[in-house]
């Protein structure tokens, strides 16, 4: 019988453990048990002035004595027999004030936290759940290690400036072993159109133009525009666009690149595509390309966002972290602690404390209050301003945001463990399926995204098995107003229908090969990811003016910042990591850890606010 993600009891566990110095090759528990609220279930021993469990073969981060600098290599995602204490809380009251509290430990929040910690700030991350990562977390069942969200990982290359995950890990002394994916996605589209997006751009271009030779020039020009934007972005040092000293410095160093980005800022991918391409089927293909990026078609997808993804997949490529996506958040959390900051789990923030118009702290579900100079919310803006802030009226800027953007639908997720022999030996890792009608692209359950991470990393599943991770859009309204029995029955029916479609299109015999099935609905994602309606993120209400209306990290409330996919530049791994970098830089400047000009700050923030009114 299928169950929702996390709806069955979890093993006591799932904390990241890494070696935290070169003193020993044994694996140590972080020497900050109060901060983590950890209670060891194993005997502990004393050595080198630190408490740690007796040596265990965790195999998470490995440190070599032969090198002066730690060489962290992720071997696998592991469970460790630890449990979290819900009644332990750090820094209660005003006896200890942090430089920043980060609400939530998604990738955006963790990047912001670690970047601040590296700059010297004292940061506390508060996570509602048992492990870090949010949508980039993981869970384990019966020997399978499942990624909670996407398994398509951008930003992991070793070159350029958009390899933001690599940079974030390196900043805190971690490096993860990755497996290059020879392709990004295999499209299976109406009229039996099949397009494989190869890692090498020239191979992808050749494949696409072989299907549409009459549009070769138009395809070349559209993707050429994408490369122009990507190359401009990739040449810049990426920091906060709300910090004028940095912004003007970049403009004087790279004026043409900055002007290129300014030109494309208010434009959408679909409009650019239509300048060069006339064939409606090619335009529909570009819609599908953009839908994966933004959950909307190309006419509603900002050109800058499309360019980041459509080019980085060839420039840096898709690289899967060995052991699973959950290792990214665990490594960042480990690095945060190594920098002297803290992370606390089972810490459910219920409200942000505002005094005299300034955000000064947070109140937890257990009534405890923790204070900081700055509060960074990694929740969506709907959760931040609709639930965490207890105000009668929305700030004007947030009111404008909610007029321009609505909550994108959530999704139905199906995690399968299947017998290996059901998949052909040359199966690609990622697939996008839209069988019959292009008009179903944005319809709930219309298209299916499928990842098979065990094609790249077989350690994620027991021998002789594969993992299939299936996504399709779904609205929370479809799952409300029914009894638990009807809810479970509907989950089973909808999941079986999706699986049957994949069986018919890709993998005959799929249904009978299933050894494990778990189904998550929008209600599941709302509960465990703490996202309003389980939303995937913001989507434009109408046709947007590119990214012009997307807010940055500062808010109308002094001392409160937002980070994540409802901030510039939006959804996706690169985008939220970029948001984290920008947020950390702006907060660091406000803390006096980076250069700052109060007069220029005020002028720039007013100017940016005015630009957003033009959207």
From Swiss-Prot:
Transit peptide, residue positions per record: 1-62
Keyword RNA-binding carried by entry: no
A cellular component annotation (GO) from this entry: chloroplast membrane
InterPro entries linked: Amino_oxidase (IPR002937), CrtISO (IPR014101), CrtISO-like (IPR045892), FAD/NAD-bd_sf (IPR036188)
GO biological process: carotenoid biosynthetic process
UniProt pathway annotation: Carotenoid biosynthesis; lycopene biosynthesis
Main location: plastid
Source species, domain of life: Eukaryota
Uppermost EC category: isomerase
Keyword NADP (UniProt): yes
Subcellular location: Plastid, Chloroplast membrane
Cofactor entry: NAD(+); NADP(+); FAD
SUPFAM superfamilies documented for this protein: FAD/NAD(P)-binding domain (SSF51905)
Reactions that this protein is recorded to catalyse: 7,7',9,9'-tetra-cis-lycopene = all-trans-lycopene
Topology with respect to the bilayer: Peripheral membrane protein
Annotated GO MF terms: carotenoid isomerase activity; oxidoreductase activity
Keyword terms of this UniProt record: Carotenoid biosynthesis, Chloroplast, FAD, Flavoprotein, Isomerase, Membrane, NAD, NADP, Plastid, Transit peptide
EC number: 5.2.1.13
Entry-linked PANTHER family: PROLYCOPENE ISOMERASE, CHLOROPLASTIC, PTHR46313
Family that this chain belongs to: Belongs to the carotenoid/retinoid oxidoreductase family. CrtISO subfamily.
Function of the protein: Carotene cis-trans-isomerase that converts 7,9,9'-tri-cis-neurosporene to 9'-cis-neurosporene and 7,9,9',7'-tetra-cis-lycopene (also known as prolycopene) into all-trans-lycopene. Isomerization requires redox-active components, suggesting that isomerization is achieved by a reversible redox reaction acting at specific double bonds. Isomerizes adjacent cis-double bonds at C7 and C9 pairwise into the trans-configuration, but is incapable of isomerizing single cis-double bonds at C9 and C9'.
Protein's name according to its UniProt entry: Prolycopene isomerase, chloroplastic
Protein's organism: Daucus carota
């Amino acid at each position: 019988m299928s169950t929702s993600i996390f709806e069955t009891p979890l093993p006591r566990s799932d904390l990241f453990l890494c070696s935290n110095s070169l003193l020993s090759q044994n694996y140590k528990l972080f020497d900050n048990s109060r901060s983590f609220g950890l209670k060891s279930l194993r005997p502990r021993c004393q050595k080198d002035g630190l408490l740690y469990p007796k040596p265990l073969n965790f195999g998470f981060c490995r440190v070599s004595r032969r090198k002066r600098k730690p060489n962290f290599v992720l071997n696998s995602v592991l469970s460790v027999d630890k449990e979290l204490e819900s009644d332990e809380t750090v820094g209660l009251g005003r006896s200890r004030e942090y430089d920043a509290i980060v609400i939530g430990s998604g990738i955006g929040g963790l990047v912001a936290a670690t970047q601040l910690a590296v700059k010297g700030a004292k940061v506390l991350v508060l996570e509602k759940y048992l492990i870090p990562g949010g949508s980039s977390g993981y869970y384990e069942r019966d020997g399978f290690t499942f990624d909670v969200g996407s398994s398509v990982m951008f930003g992991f290359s070793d070159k350029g400036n958009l390899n933001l995950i690599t940079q974030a890990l390196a900043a805190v002394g971690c490096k993860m072993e990755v497996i290059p994916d020879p392709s990004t996605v295999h499209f299976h589209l109406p009229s039996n159109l099949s397009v494989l997006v190869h890692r090498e751009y020239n191979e992808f271009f050749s494949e696409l133009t072989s299907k549409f030779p009459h549009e070769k020039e138009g395809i070349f020009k559209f993707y050429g525009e994408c490369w122009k934007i990507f190359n401009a972005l990739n040449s810049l040092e990426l920091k906060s666009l709300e910090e004028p000293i940095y912004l003007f410095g970049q403009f004087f160093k790279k004026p043409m690149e900055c002007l290129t980005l300014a030109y494309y800022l208010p434009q959408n991918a679909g409009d650019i595509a239509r300048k060069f391409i006339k064939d409606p089927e090619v335009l529909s293909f570009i819609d599908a390309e953009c839908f994966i990026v933004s959950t909307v078609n190309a006419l509603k997808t900002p050109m800058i966002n499309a360019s980041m993804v459509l080019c980085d997949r060839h420039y840096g490529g898709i690289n899967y972290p060995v052991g699973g996506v959950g290792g990214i958040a665990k490594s960042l959390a480990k690095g945060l602690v190594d920098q002297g900051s803290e992370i606390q789990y089972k810490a459910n923030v219920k409200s942000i404390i505002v005094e005299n118009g300034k955000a000064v702290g947070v109140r937890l579900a257990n009534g405890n209050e923790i204070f900081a100079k700055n509060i960074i919310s990694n929740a969506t803006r709907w959760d931040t301003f609709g639930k965490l802030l207890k105000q009668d009226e929305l700030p004007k800027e947030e009111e404008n945001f909610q007029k321009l953007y609505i909550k994108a639908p959530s999704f139905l997720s199906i995690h399968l463990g299947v017998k290996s022999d059901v998949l052909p030996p040359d199966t690609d890792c990622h697939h996008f399926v839209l069988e019959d009608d292009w008009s179903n692209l944005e319809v709930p359950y219309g298209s299916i995204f499928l990842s098979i991470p065990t094609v790249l990393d077989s350690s994620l599943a027991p021998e002789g098995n594969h993992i299939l991770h299936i996504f399709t859009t779904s609205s929370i309204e479809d799952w409300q107003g029914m009894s638990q029995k009807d809810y479970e029955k509907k989950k089973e029916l909808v999941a079986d229908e999706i699986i049957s479609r994949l069986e018919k299109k890709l993998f005959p015999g799929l249904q009978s090969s299933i050894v494990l099935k778990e189904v998550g609905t929008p209600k599941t994602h709302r509960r465990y990811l703490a996202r309003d309606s389980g939303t995937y993120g913001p989507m434009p209400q109408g046709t947007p003016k590119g990214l012009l209306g997307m807010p940055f990290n500062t808010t109308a409330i002094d001392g409160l910042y937002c980070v994540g996919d409802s901030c510039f530049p939006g959804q996706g791994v690169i985008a939220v990591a970029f948001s984290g970098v920008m947020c950390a830089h702006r907060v660091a400047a406000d803390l006096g850890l980076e250069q700052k000009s109060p007069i220029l700050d005020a002028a720039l923030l007013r100017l940016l606010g005015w630009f957003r009114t033009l959207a």
